[in-house]
């Protein structure tokens, strides 16, 4: 009986691990709702953008730093690919600075290799540098 239970648990664990994606599917209703809401308030050159996941979204950044003209672009559950997908509306405003909190959900909830995640992260940083070169980026 113990052997049967161990076999069933091992099989369930293997199936669960095999089903984890290499990258997260960030495109749920919540993501699109938050993205739409955020994009309705355009980024301006005097803004400091907080870009990230739920850790960013839940921060009261504008209250903490009122003189910095902070706008919060955090979306709970977001991943590097999701941030890259919404980067156009951010860099179009040529913000003064971007604080980036990215990769946490990728590492916790997907099986993406650290090297692949690093390449996604580098592409995100390269796009910011190319499309908004005067923007300071803080990681």
Residue ranges and their predicted role:
Residues 63-64, 69, 84-139:
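Alpha-helical cap/lid subdomain in secreted, periplasmic
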């Amino acid at each position: 009986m113990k052997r049967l239970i161990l076999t069933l648990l091992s099989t369930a664990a293997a199936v669960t691990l095999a089903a984890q994606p290499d990258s997260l599917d960030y495109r749920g209703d919540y993501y699109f709702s938050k993205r739409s809401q955020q994009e309705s308030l355009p980024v301006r050159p005097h803004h400091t953008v907080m870009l990230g996941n739920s850790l960013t979204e839940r921060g009261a950044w504008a209250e903490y730093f009122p003189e910095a003209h902070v706008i919060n672009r955090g979306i709970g559950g977001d991943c590097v690919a999701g941030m890259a997908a919404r980067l156009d509306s951010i860099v179009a405003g040529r913000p003064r600075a971007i604080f980036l909190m990215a990769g946490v959900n990728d590492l916790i909830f997907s099986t993406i290799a650290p090297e692949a995640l690093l390449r996604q992260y580098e592409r995100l940083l390269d796009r910011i540098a190319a499309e908004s070169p005067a923007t300071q980026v803080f990681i």
